[in-house]
Amino acid sequence: MRYRALVLFSVLSVLVVSAVGSGAGADARQTSLADEMDRASGEYGVPGELLLAMGYVNTRWEMPPPSASDYKADDPEGRGNYGVMALVRNPSEDTLGRASALTGESVEAIKNDRASNVRGGAAVLADLAGEEKPRDLDGWYDAVSRYGGGELYAQQVYEVLREGAAATTSTGERLELAPREVEVPALYSAQATGDYPRSRWYGNGGRNYTESRREPTSDVNTIVIHMTQGSWSSAINYFASSSNESASAHYTVRSSDGFIGQSVRESDIAWHAGWWPTNKHSIGIEHEGYVDQPRWFTDAMYRSSARLSAYLAVKYHIPIDRKHIIEHKQVPGCSTGGGGVGCHTDPGRYWNWRKYMDLVKDRARTIRNNTYQQVVDNATPGRFKASDHWNVSRRHTTISYGPNQRVLPRPLSVSRNAAFKIRTPARGSYRVYGWWPADRDYNARTMFRIKTTGGWTRRTVNQQINGGRWIYLGTYNLAENDSYRVEVSSKSPGRGRVVADAVKVMRS
């Protein structure tokens, strides 16, 4: 059924400042993105400002050619998303075909013609919402989530709705989206930190990478720079999809603020380069955007990515030069769809390599001058103590930090805490992390205690989740000394086993 948008898109949501091309007549108006979205909004009952926000997240309101992201197996950029509305066709998803069926337009028209693409996107979104359309913008959140392959996409769209957006397209059309009062759910409030402390862990589909135990001393010697050819959230969602069996990357950097998501552990091999010898010894970093649209290359993204590359270069002893920090184009051969030379140009001619490498070098010098980190495992000699109440357990050794853990069968009414001895070389601010193997019979309200310069403080964690990774416990001011200052409490208001496995401190 037809359903008029609640808000007049052309009046309240978008201001068209300049017409397309040199003429300002009817032909120019017919080709404006604002008009195309207005018509699609009216035809399918989808709020126009929602279409506009989605288009901004997808492509910054550009219409990339189909070749920009045609599906290719083993290629993290070739996810098969098309047009300003990022309609998808790959082995696990086909919103492009769905759009064709709903609108009666051919797949080729939707891939190549912007108005058809906008119409197809609106039709799919309306179909996902069901016959009874939501009565406000917040009500469309679930449909947007399903459209984009997960809640991360919806969150990115709704952040744009809340903040507003403005841009001039390559055709000269100026579009402005006014801020809206919408609710942006806080996703993953207890999300695990990635291997890189400034990243967030999102995970992978399980069949799109190679499990390994690469050693920092010798197994990683290259960093490969990529472009997503799509939005940040679409890349993260694709890498996390259980139906994706072909491609992944270790990290993905967001354009707007430099936020970093991790999809594959550094110790494992991501399928990002399309050339096994490169994959085997490299870390792949994706960057949100398109190779031919330099507006995506923000200062925030450059600086955040350079900080990450500097961290990796120091950690893995990677030389900071263009032989070891390379573009996807430099990867040898085209053995698969994801190969480099002759197959890819990313990050493309607009990527400022001089700026990027200078930032990496500057940050690496700072890291080398200020880096301090200590990891203490429950098996570290002279640095862990616990009463006989804590049993040595070799359960879940594949996701414990070391060969075992200490387990308290049930919380006690008295303090018999397990304690880790931590050395801090100078008074200052330190990040503290905990590690444990998770299990459903573990305690959901385990208490960590950290001794700061102001006394003992507590942090409660759920040990039923987030196992086998470093979990951020907070940043604290610690005194200069070497003492038992991080504990796992023997007391807990919850039920279940309490685990003491490993802790880590890092200078902030």
What are these model-derived regions, one by one?
Residues 487-497:
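Short beta-strand-plus-loop segments that form exposed binding edges in beta-rich domains
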Residues 453-481:
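Extracellular carbohydrate recognition and processing domains
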Residues 416-440:
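A short beta-strand element within beta-rich, extracytoplasmic domains
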Residues 156-203, 291-373, 508:
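Basic/polar, cationic surfaces and motifs that engage anionic cell-wall
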Residues 28-163:
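Catalytic glycan-binding domains that act on GlcNAc-containing polysaccharides
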Residues 1-27:
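Secretory targeting and sorting signals
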Residues 369-415:
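Glycan-recognition and processing domains
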Residues 194-319, 409-411, 423, 439, ...:
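Active-site-adjacent loop/helix surface patches within enzyme catalytic domains
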